[in-house]
Design a protein with these regions (language model features):
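Active-site loop immediately N-terminal to the catalytic Tyr-X3-Lys motif
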Residues: 46-52, 74-75, 118, 136
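Active-site helix of classical SDR
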Residues: 21, 57, 65
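Short C-terminal tail/terminal secondary-structure segment
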Residues: 46, 130-131, 142-160
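Substrate-binding pocket helix/loop in short-chain dehydrogenase/reductase
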Residues: 2-10, 107, 111
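C-terminal helical subdomain
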Residues: 81, 104-137, 141, 150
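Residue(s) in the substrate-gating loop at a strand-loop-helix junction
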Residues: 41
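Alpha-helical segment proximal to the catalytic Tyr-Lys
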Residues: 26, 70-74, 139
Length: 160
């Protein structure tokens, strides 16, 4: 990965949420409340080959989320994050396609075998947590990252 590619990932996955937060927080302070939901990632908890920039950006976003909570919580602003696990999207489709011999892609087998839910997540799996974090029911939830990962972090965390 080049330095420019690294910077681009940081710009999209860390700097953009920071800039968005700076833009909306003054209005939230004036209004007396607000909710920010950042899309973090389970990769903020893991070190994995080939995802250094992404993991660094999402780790930074996790800490930005917690710091916005600390800095602006007194203004009744909640800042939380959703940490998706492996989600079935068009971007991950090549990893879920059957091989020419009819077998599953090795990464697909890995995800299914290591995720206690035994499946990839779907975008729909993220809707309920987002609705909860945006609702009044989460008014006392602040600075939290809600991992929606089918349990893979718990499973990987217990491995030797």
């Amino acid at each position: 990965m080049s330095v420019e590619e690294f910077r681009q990932v940081i710009d999209i996955d860390l700097n953009a949420p920071f800039i968005m937060s700076k833009a909306v927080i003054p209005g939230m302070i004036k209004k007396g409340h607000g909710k920010i939901i950042n899309i973090c990632s389970m990769m903020s908890e893991l070190g994995r080959e080939t995802v250094s920039a992404y993991a660094a950006a999402k780790g930074g976003l996790k800490m930005l989320t917690r710091n916005i909570c600390s800095e602006f919580g007194e203004h009744n602003i909640q800042c939380n994050g959703i940490g998706p696990g492996y989600i079935a999207t068009p971007q991950t489709a090549p990893l879920r396609e059957l091989q020419a011999d009819g077998s599953r892609h090795p990464f697909d087998r890995f995800i299914i075998s290591k995720t206690p839910a035994a499946r990839w997540g779907t975008p729909d799996d993220l809707m309920g947590p987002a609705v909860f974090l945006a609702s009044d029911a989460s008014d006392f939830v602040n600075g939290h990252i809600l991992y929606v990962d089918g349990g893979i972090l718990a499973y990987i965390g217990k491995q030797p």
